[in-house]
């Protein structure tokens, strides 16, 4: 886990040159923009991609500051990060309230810088710039989507927002193909499929996997939710 990141880094995990297929992925771990799940949603994902011939680049982007003490941080997060109380459920037929928009200017700048580095060093790393995409997990999924919708410098070939926000968005005409994964028992899932419908209605390619079990934060999959373990193969096969 990483916290209080004030300087972004980009770490490449490259495939065996004999197995490389030219595709590249920026991997953005999640953690509510307060910490980063570097192992479960960063290094493990990057290694799985590299094992399948895809150059992976783990982006450790800037975060909101948190308490210096790990104990204090855990206590704060336990109070503010959990399943919504039943009283917060909207009336039948009404969509849940959308969360307030966060300022992601720093994180977007970090993603744009990572993309620029990939373009600059593509030949060195054996990367096909026309096959460079981005995947992210929860907050990283939000950053992936934010980059897709708002960046003026990134031209992503594909995106994979994994168990991220599902609300509807305004899809650009040139939006990249999207691969989306979610578990139905994710405590943050509110029964919305807006982003999927938005992509579909815009006529842009989209593939969506809804697993019955897996909860939130399953990364590459849990042993007790074997279906989720297929997500890396599904994603790499899709790219």
Where are these regions (language model features)?
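Short amphipathic alpha-helix adjacent to the substrate-entry channel of hydrolases
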Residues: 39-57
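N-terminal cap/lid segment of alpha/beta-hydrolase-fold proteins
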Residues: 1-20, 51
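Short beta-strand/loop motif that positions the catalytic acidic residue
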Residues: 179-182
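Short beta-strand element of the alpha/beta-hydrolase
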Residues: 21-30
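C-terminal catalytic histidine-bearing segment of alpha/beta-hydrolase fold enzymes
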Residues: 13, 200-239
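Acidic catalytic loop of the alpha/beta-hydrolase fold
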Residues: 184-190
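Alpha/beta-hydrolase active-site loop
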Residues: 72-123, 232-233
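Primarily recognizes the serine-hydrolase "nucleophile elbow" in alpha/beta-hydrolase
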Residues: 102-175
